[in-house]
Structures are given as C-alpha cells and as structure tokens.
C-alpha cells in the first residue's frame, strides 16, 4: 500500500489492536482510536495488563484492518512506535470529543463498558470531565501496509 492508501485506511477505521511486549510473551488487545491532527489517540482504562505494559514504556505495534467476510478483499496497516500519556488539556479534550463523536455515530453505548463506564451509560457521558486516560502514538518508526491484489 502506498502512503495515501495507508492514511485512508487509518482515517476510515476506529478499532485497532495494540501489541505490547509482555514479560514472557506478547500481549495484544483491541482499542478504539481516533485520528486528530494526524496523530492516533487511544482510550485506556486505568487497570489491566495493558497499563503495566504501558508503564514499562516499551515500543508497541498498532494494527488496523478492513476486510470482507470471505477475505476476497482485505487491507491492513501496522505502525510501530511508542505510547505517551496525553497531559495537555486541550489536546486531551479534542481526542475525547472525537472519540465520543465516532462512538455516537458508529458504536453501541454497550461499548462504553469496555471504556470502564457502567452498563447503561450513554456516549454523552464520555467527556473530558471524566477520568479518561488518553494515550497518543508517538515516534512512529515504521508503517507497513498490505492489501489484496
């Protein structure tokens, strides 16, 4: 895939997988993401294996894909880089607002449980007033894309 195709796939999707370097084996988990000003942002809950791996500060791989059910058409991108906690209030707010917008349009409110919200929550509750951890992919060292012929 060329750079334009890679960027198109990244901008059109909203779910990815992040692979972390675990202690004895890799660890992979799904995440909602958004693109704001050319950067990828993810929401992390403040618990689970991913947090201990994130705190280690080791490089990660992010995988984004699109495919048809029979795999006659597919495309995927892998990005290698580092994850950084977003502490700037305005940057964090922009990422949260975009995640909530994507969530309202394309995801069930049930998905908010994966974000650490109680069942029955609504996307209007996903705001920068909440203790939501926003993580940015930084220092992207490699982008690889592959698509069906």
Language-model segment annotations:
Residues 45-49, 100:
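Short, solvent-exposed aromatic-acidic interface loops
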Residues 46, 57-66, 75-84:
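Active-site-adjacent structural patch at catalytic or cofactor/ligand-binding sites
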Residues 71-149:
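Charged, gly/pro-rich active-site loop segments
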Residues 51-55:
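Surface-exposed connector loops and short turns at secondary-structure junctions
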Residues 13-46, 63:
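Short beta-strand segments
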Residues 1-17:
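Short, basic/aromatic recognition patches
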Residues 21, 67, 121-123:
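Short, solvent-exposed loop/turn elements at beta->coil junctions and helix N-caps
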Residues 36, 45, 65, 84-86, ...:
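Solvent-exposed residues in well-ordered beta-strands and their adjoining turns
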